[in-house]
Each structure stands twice: as structure tokens, then as C-alpha cells.
Amino acid sequence: MDKQKVTALTQKHRSLFRFLFRLHNRFPFVNRRKGRIRTQAGLSYLKGCRITGGAGNTLIIGDYARLKNCVFHIEGTGNTVQIGPWCYCENAEFWIEDSGCTISLGAHTALCGNIQLAAMEGTNITVGEDCLFSSAVRLRTGDSHSLLKKSTGERINPSASIAIGNHVWVGTNVTILKGVRVADGCVVGAGSLLTKAYSQPNCVLAGVPAREVKLDVDWTPERIPVREIL
């Protein structure tokens, strides 16, 4: 059944489907909860997920999102994790260590296994719509520990937010560090380390540290046959 038919059917009987999804998601043998995080799940499907953290935090999951074996660990207060509609997340970990942080995924974004998103010290991780993350990807807005200038004791490694644009494909084993910006339509090569803002849209980023290696690209999850070169 395609997305339009699913949407039409569930919206016609929204109250019933909302009750059924909510009942399923709350079964303790399906998902585990600990703490007082406010959760809004709508018409979403969760299985094998673990949600822990303190009061004053919010988890919002959009309609038709599917989450399998995900971990939400939200400490502090005033934090929000928002998963957009039609997202797919499997074996993903969402970690917030302090207060005033946000992690958000745009609609139709997919996290495909062993992925960690960690925000701290009031920073944000923002991922746009229609993005695709391969396995073993790490996004961190900070270092979790303090790096100091020896002579003064001043801390020199502040945390900084991460922003990923729309329609970005991130390959396997990629690390995205604090302060990174990635423009719309980009592709990040496997094993790359992103350390800065990349403002050029529709390019391939690759390397350690990553740099622009190809311009004027686009991508699709479909496997299109390559035309034979005569």
C-alpha cells in the first residue's frame, strides 16, 4: 500500500488508529520507559525502543514514523527530540547530556543502523527532510570534556550546533563534529570526517578532513541502470 492510501485510510479513522498505535507503543514488552519524559507519538510505530530521562523534556514523533531498537537518553531539562513524519530509524541513539538542547529530523529521513546523535550544552542537531544516513554515523555537538589553555585555565573547546540540509546522503562510518553545516543535496563519502561548514550545495564531500571533491551532483535511493558508454 502506497503512502497516499495509508494516509487516506488512517486519517479517515484517525481516532481508532491513534488508539491502536498508542496501545501498542505503551506495552512494556514492546518498548521500555524510565523517567518522566513527555512523549507525543501520534500515528507512529515503535518497537524495541528505550526512553529514559528526566521531567521537563519532550519527545515528539510524527505520524507514520517507524522506530526500531532506538535509544532516547535525555538528561537535564527543557530538551526536545523531534522525529518528523514518515521517518525511519533503526538502532539509532539520541543522547542529550545537558539542558536546552534540540535534536530534530525532517520528514522522510532515514537512519539505517548504529547511528548516534549527541547534543550538549544548549546546542542543536538539525537534520533536514529526505536525508539518508548509512550505518556507523556519529554526530556530536561537543567533546563532553573540557580542553583548557594551560597558561590561563580558560576553556577553549566550546560546543556548537550541527545543521544538515535537505536531501543529504551520508555514507557509512562518517563522523560529523561540532559546528558542521552541510548544504542541501550533498553526498558525504564513506569514512569521512566533517569538521566545518560546507556551503556548496549538490556536491560530494569526502576525506579526512572532508573537502569538496565533485560538484553538480544529485542522488536518488533508486538504483538507476547506468547507460553503456559507446
Where in this protein do the model-derived segments appear?
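Domain-scale signature associated with acetyltransferase and cell-envelope carbohydrate enzymes
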Residues: 1-141, 158-161, 165-167, 174, ...
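Regulatory activation segment
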Residues: 151-157
